Amino acid sequence: MSQITDVYAREILDSRGNPTLEVEVFLESGAMGRAAVPSGASTGEREALELRDGDKGRYLGKGVLKAVANVNDIIAEEVIGMEATDQVGIDRKMLELDGTEFKSKLGANAILGVSLAVAKAAADEVGLSLYQYIGGANAKELPLPMMNIINGGAHADNNVDIQEFMIMPAGAKNFAEALRMGAEIFHALKSVLKGKGYNTAVGDEGGFAPNLKSNEEALEVIIEAIQKAGFKPGEDVLLALDVASSELFSDGVYTLENEAQPKKTADQLIDFYENLVNKYPIISIEDGMAENDWEGWKKMTERLGKRIQIVGDDLFVTNPKILKEGIDKGIANSILIKLNQIGTLTETLDAIEMAKRAGYTTVISHRSGETEDTTLADLSVAVNAGQIKTGSLCRTDRVCKYNQLLRIEDELDAVALFRGKEVFYNLKKK
């Protein structure tokens, strides 16, 4: 009864007003799955290809009708008749159909839309929530959220170099409390910024995007907001950064325009991070080095890898092959997991499995162009990832993931697990 009878894709809009793909998969039993595909602003060079039309007369060239046609005319024909419960077989079939390293023929957006919709249809067929279907009986850990409350870099039109300044309510006793703490700090931060005469407009991911005197001032106002909300920095709430430093790297030099000394070598940039880690309760830095600066990554891991989580995003692009190379070379100690960087659910699960076996932490992540789809909330619980990064405490495209996690926590009830600071299991205990 789980045979696929129809697959249909359409073009919809994402949270930035750009087109993206939505796919529906129908089964013989009447079960159905629907999935929408996200899109990134700062992307890694080795990410799977997001297929766009390039027709400047339509959606400024960003239409996805080619990807829609690839689903409706090519992929559908091949997967109709297959069992939706054969996730690996279906994903493998699509990879064979595409036949390219970066999914550039059919488009990773086309392939991922089908891959996720198939999983949702199969879950519907067997009467399970998506997290239970993917993860089985042991899927029970709610993730510690990384909440992006100040946006800079490619995610905002301001003068802040670092792309994301995040809070992690690690002192919370459960996910619902972590969410409440995050929301209260978010509102306190708005008040702090207003009091200093700063703009409180928000960026792509719902964080504030003011022009600040320095990157460090962003940390200062966040600390002030944490205290104003009645919490203790370093105890109740930890900080995390996403530097997206590939965007700052050119000709072997990193340029942080908002710093007194903008030009920095890899060593000087690591000094800069070390100073911040000594001064503020920073537990995690993502993409601290450019994706091709493996020497810089190695140095950063050696100097800071016992103290903080060093996350590879553009570095690893959720790709098991690249991750294996990083593990072998002792680079980073954590991987950011983005479904559309690799393009199938199966390959995503392979990357998570490999990371966990190597003692790397995993952070399930959204993209800056999101939709109302909440798959990644379910995925974070399915694999007991321990951490999720899905934006700020406003904008429905971000909050819908948090709300789905509240539902999952309710459903799991007494079985639900929330580990707070213990998610950083691979760091040296202080």
UniProtKB/Swiss-Prot annotation:
Main subcellular location of this protein, as a coarse class: cytoplasm
GO biological-process terms attached to the record: glycolytic process
Recorded GO MF terms: magnesium ion binding; phosphopyruvate hydratase activity
PROSITE patterns documented for this protein: ENOLASE
Pathway: Carbohydrate degradation; glycolysis; pyruvate from D-glyceraldehyde 3-phosphate: step 4/5
Active site residues according to the UniProt entry: E205, K338
Enzyme nomenclature, EC number: 4.2.1.11
Keyword vocabulary terms for this entry: Cytoplasm, Glycolysis, Lyase, Magnesium, Metal-binding, Secreted
Matching InterPro entries: Enolase, Enolase-like_C_sf, Enolase-like_N, Enolase_C, Enolase_CS, Enolase_N
Domain of life of the organism encoding this protein: Bacteria
Localization per Swiss-Prot or TrEMBL: Cytoplasm; Secreted; Cell surface
Protein residues bound to Mg(2+): D242, E286, D313
GO cellular component: cell surface; extracellular region; phosphopyruvate hydratase complex
Xref: SMART domains: Enolase_C (SM01192), Enolase_N (SM01193)
SUPFAM superfamilies listed in its UniProt record: Enolase C-terminal domain-like, Enolase N-terminal domain-like
Protein name: Enolase
